[in-house]
C-alpha cells in the first residue's frame, strides 16, 4: 500500500542515480554507515521508507548503557557497550545526558547477585562501585527507600532522534545523499550479483531506481523482508517491548534493578520526562508494523516500576509506545532456541553466493557506531578502499564544543530559550537563534521550542511534515502532547514553504491523530481530561473534524508509539 503524498514536501530530480554504496534503513545504524562511508570518501545513498529513526531506533529507553546490564550473562556485549559509552560521551555529547546510574537490590532480590554483578562488571571493564543504601537515597531521593543494596555505574541517557539526525547531517555535509519516504520494493540482480534497488517514492508517487556495486541492508527487524527480495533467508524473531513516558523527570539517575533482566526494571530520565520499561514478548513477524500497548503491559510497567521509584504510581503518564528488538537466529538453529542479541554482519557473497549484498543487524542503539564501522570496513574491503574509520574520534555536528561554551555565545538570550536550544542542538544552536526576531518567538512552551528551531529543522534537518518536525525538535512531545503547539507549528510549516495551506491542515490532522494513538493506552485521569480539552479545542473551535480524514495508508506514514 502507498502512503499519502499530500503530507510531504516535494523533492526535485527523480531520475535514476548511481553511487558506490546503497544503504537501506534510516535508523541509527544506517545513518552511522552513511556517515562512516562519507568520512572515508565513499559515495553513498541512504534510502528510508519513512522518516529517520521510525523503527527500533526511536522506540527504546534512550539509555546510554554502561554495559552493566549485560555483564553477568553477556560479557562481549558488556565490553562493547562500555567502550561505545565512552566514545559517545565525546563525539555525541549534545545527545547525551551524563546522569550516571544506580543498580538497586530490593528485599525480595538476592544480595548474592550483587556480588556476582560487581565481579562481572570488573571483568568487563565497567567501573561499578557498591555504595551504602543510605547514600543511594541521598544521591537519588526518588529511589525505593526499602533498598538493601546499591551499585553506581556509568549509565546515562541519549536521545535517539537527535543522535540519528546528527549522523545524517554529518553524512550529507560530507557528500552522502539521503532519501526519506523512499521505500525499497525489490533488489535489482544481474546474474549472481545485486547491482541496485527498485524503490517507491511516496512523496511523488512514482517508482525510482538506484544503482551501486554494493547494497547494505541495515533495515533492522525489517531486514529479513529485504533479504527475501533476493531469495535469502535471515530468520529473525521479533521481541516486542512496551514502555511508558512519565510526565516529568521523577529521577536524576538511571535506576536499574540489580537482578537478572526482567520486565520494567529500568527507569531512565531524559529531556523533560522519564521512561519506564520495558516488557518483552515474542510477536509474529507479520505484526512488526502493527504493535499496540496492551492494558496488561501498562499494568506490569506500573506494578514493577513503582518498586524502583514509589512516586511513579502517582505520576501522570503522557503516553505509551512499543518497539521491537531484532533477535537473529543462527544459521544452524532456525528454530530460534539460540537467538543472538549481539551484532550480526553477513557477507552474502560468502554465505549465499550472492555478490554485492551485505546485511548488518542485531546489536543495540549503544553499539550503532561499532556496527557501522564493521559494515563500512567490509564495504571498503569489497571496493578496494583503504581509508580508516574516524567516527570514534570526530565529533558529530553539535558536539564540537561543550554546552557551557555554546551558552556563553548566546548569553544575551532569555535563559529558557538559550538552555533548551543548546541542550538539543549543542554547538549548532547559534544557527537557530541569530537570524531575526521571529526566531525567538515560542512555538512549544512545554519543550521551549522556538520558531527559529523550527526554521533550522526545516532548512538543515530534512523535515517533510509535522511528525518529522517532532523528531527533530520535540514539538508536541511535552506535557500537553501538542495541544497548544501543533497549530502554531503547522502555520510555520506553511510560512517556511514546507507545505501549502491545505497540506499544513492535513499534516495537523495527521499529527494530532498520531499523538492520540500513543495516549489512548493510558487514557485515564489527567491524560483523558487533557485529551478531551484538546479534542474540544481542535474539533469544536478550530473545526479540524471538517478536514477529510487520512486513510490507513497515510497513517502508516505518520506512525505513532514513539516518545
UniProtKB/Swiss-Prot annotation:
It catalyses: a quinone + sn-glycerol 3-phosphate = dihydroxyacetone phosphate + a quinol. Its main location: membrane. Keywords: Cell inner membrane, Cell membrane, FAD, Flavoprotein, Membrane, Oxidoreductase. Pathway: Polyol metabolism; glycerol degradation via glycerol kinase pathway; glycerone phosphate from sn-glycerol 3-phosphate (anaerobic route): step 1/1. GO terms for biological process: glycerol catabolic process; glycerol-3-phosphate catabolic process. Disulfide bonds: none annotated. The keyword Oxidoreductase applies. The keyword Cell division does not apply. FAD binds at residues 20-48. PANTHER family: ANAEROBIC GLYCEROL-3-PHOSPHATE DEHYDROGENASE SUBUNIT A (PTHR11985:SF35), GLYCEROL-3-PHOSPHATE DEHYDROGENASE (PTHR11985). Belongs to the FAD-dependent glycerol-3-phosphate dehydrogenase family. This is Anaerobic glycerol-3-phosphate dehydrogenase subunit A. It comes from Haemophilus influenzae (strain ATCC 51907 / DSM 11121 / KW20 / Rd). The gene is glpA.
Amino acid at each position: 500500500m502507498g502512503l499519502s503524498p499530500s503530507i510531504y514536501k516535494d523533492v526535485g530530480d527523480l531520475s535514476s542515480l548511481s553511487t558506490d554504496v546503497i544503504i537501506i534503513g534510516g535508523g541509527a545504524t544506517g545513518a552511522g554507515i552513511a556517515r562512516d562511508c562519507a568520512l572515508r570518501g565513499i559515495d553513498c545513498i541512504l534510502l528510508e521508507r519513512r522518516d529517520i529513526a521510525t523503527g527500533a531506533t526511536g522506540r527504546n529507553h534512550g539509555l546510554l548503557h554502561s554495559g552493566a546490564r549485560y555483564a553477568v550473562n553477556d560479557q562481549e556485549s558488556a565490553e562493547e557497550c562500555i567502550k561505545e559509552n565512552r566514545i559517545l560521551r565525546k563525539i555525541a555529547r549534545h545527545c547525551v545526558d551524563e546522569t550516571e546510574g544506580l543498580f538497586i537490590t530490593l528485599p525480595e532480590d538476592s544480595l548474592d547477585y550483587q556480588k556476582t554483578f560487581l565481579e562481572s562488571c570488573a571483568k568487563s571493564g565497567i567501573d561499578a562501585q557498591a555504595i551504602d543504601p543510605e547514600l543511594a537515597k541521598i544521591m537519588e531521593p526518588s529511589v525505593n527507600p526499602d533498598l538493601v543494596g546499591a551499585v553506581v555505574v556509568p549509565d546515562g541517557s541519549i536521545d535517539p532522534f537527535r543522535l540519528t539526525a546528527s549522523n545524517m547531517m554529518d553524512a550529507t555535509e560530507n557528500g552522502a545523499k539521503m532519501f526519506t519516504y523512499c521505500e525499497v520494493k525489490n533488489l535489482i540482480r544481474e546474474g549472481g550479483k545485486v547491482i541496485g534497488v527498485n524503490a517507491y517514492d511516496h512523496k511523488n508517487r512514482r517508482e525510482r531506481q538506484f544503482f551501486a556495486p554494493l547494497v547494505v541492508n541495515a533495515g533492522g527487524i525489517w531486514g529479513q523482508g529485504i533479504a527475501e527480495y533476493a531469495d535469502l533467508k535471515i530468520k529473525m524473531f521479533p521481541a516486542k517491548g512496551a514502555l511508558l513516558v512519565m510526565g516529568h523527570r521523577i529521577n536524576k539517575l538511571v535506576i536499574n534493578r540489580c537482578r537478572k533482566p526482567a520486565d520494567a526494571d529500568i527507569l531512565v530520565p531524559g529531556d523533560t520526562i522519564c521512561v519506564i520499561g520495558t516488557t518483552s514478548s515474542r510477536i509474529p513477524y507479520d505484526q512488526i508494523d502493527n504493535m499496540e500497548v496492551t492494558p496488561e503491559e501498562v499494568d506490569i510497567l506500573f506494578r514493577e516500576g513503582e518498586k524502583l521509584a514509589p512516586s511513579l504510581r502517582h505520576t501522570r503518564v503522557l503516553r505509551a509506545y512499543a518497539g521491537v528488538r531484532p533477535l537473529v537466529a543462527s544459521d544452524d538453529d532456525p528454530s530460534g532456541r539460540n537467538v543472538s542479541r549481539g551484532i550480526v554482519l553477513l557477507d552474502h557473497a560468502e554465505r549465499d553466493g550472492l555478490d554485492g549484498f551485505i546485511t548488518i543487524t542485531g546489536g543495540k542503539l549503544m553499539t550503532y557506531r561499532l556496527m557501522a564501522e564493521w559494515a563500512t570496513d567490509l564495504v571498503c574491503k569489497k571496493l578496494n578502499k583503504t581509508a580508516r574509520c574516524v567516527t570514534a574520534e570526530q565529533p558529530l555536528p553539535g558536539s564540537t564544543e561543550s554546552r557551557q561554551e555554546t551558552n556563553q555565545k548566546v548569553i544575551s538570550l532569555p535563559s529558557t530559550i538559550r538552555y533548551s536550544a543548546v541542550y538539543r542542538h549543542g554547538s549548532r544552536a547559534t544557527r537557530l537563534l541569530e537570524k531575526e526576531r521571529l526566531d525567538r518567538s515560542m512555538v512549544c512552551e512545554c519543550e521551549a521550542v522556538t520558531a527559529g528551531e523550527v526554521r533550522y529543522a526545516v532548512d538543515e534537518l530534512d523535515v517533510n511534515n509535522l511528525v518529522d518536525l517532532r523528531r527533530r525538535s520535540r514539538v508536541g512531545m511535552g506535557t500537553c502532547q501538542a495541544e497548544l503547539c501543533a497549530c502554531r507549528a503547522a502555520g510555520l510549516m506553511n510560512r517556511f514553504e514546507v507545505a501549502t495551506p491545505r497540506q499544513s491542515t492535513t499534516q495537523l490532522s495527521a499529527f494530532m491523530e498520531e499523538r492520540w494513538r500513543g495516549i489512548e493506552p493510558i487514557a485515564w485521569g489527567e491524560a483523558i481530561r487533557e485529551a478531551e480539552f484538546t479534542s474540544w479545542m481542535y474539533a469544536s473551535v478550530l473545526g479540524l473534524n471538517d478536514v477529510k480524514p487520512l486513510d490507513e495508508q497515510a497513517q502508516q506514514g505518520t506512525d505513532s508509539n514513539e516518545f
